[in-house]
């Protein structure tokens, strides 16, 4: 038996587990959105970060990295135990088909695990839902947690997508809006309080392609 896992957020640049093969490619009918709260890595229960999850969207594609773990049940178990601890804010695991640029009609791997979240604020305390770009940017610009600040996560994702040569306008637009927030005068920043989410209650400059500068 072989384990395949698809990463579309920090797993792209920081898998953190022992794997045997990495492929760059995409899954179909999903898009990346910053609609999930993170309260223990890049944010806190009082001021949650915004991190990636997937939203079903017919005709969309989401680029990322697929990791293969071979070597028997024990190795696969160790990888999954690590991932389930790390991805604890995702309440679902979905099986998807994984494609590469070499063949867009036939998946190169089937039965690939991807961590997803239920898009419902009632049943899923970590689901923030969509928000205006400026509001999301303000939340990302101000949130921080034990593993670092939220904006670093976003900027690293932006760079990771650049590195795999599949930049995403949604990520770039959000990252640039965060940069705008960070460039505000200090007296204006002081008026922009961090976004407080329902999670705390429940749980106590776009540069030309291939030449982008990733300033934080």
UniProtKB/Swiss-Prot annotation:
One of its GO terms (cellular component) is cytoplasm. Binds 2 Mn(2+) ions per subunit. The keyword Lyase applies. One of its GO terms (biological process) is response to cadmium ion. CDD domains: GGCT_like. GO terms for molecular function: gamma-glutamylcyclotransferase activity; glutathione specific gamma-glutamylcyclotransferase activity. It is an enzyme of class 4 (lyase). Expressed in the central vascular bundle of roots, leaf veins, hydathodes, cauline leaves, shoot apex, sepal veins, flower receptacles and developing seeds. InterPro entries: ChaC (IPR006840), GGCT-like (IPR013024). Induction: By cadmium and lead. Induced by arsenite. This is Gamma-glutamylcyclotransferase 2-1. The gene is GGCT2;1.
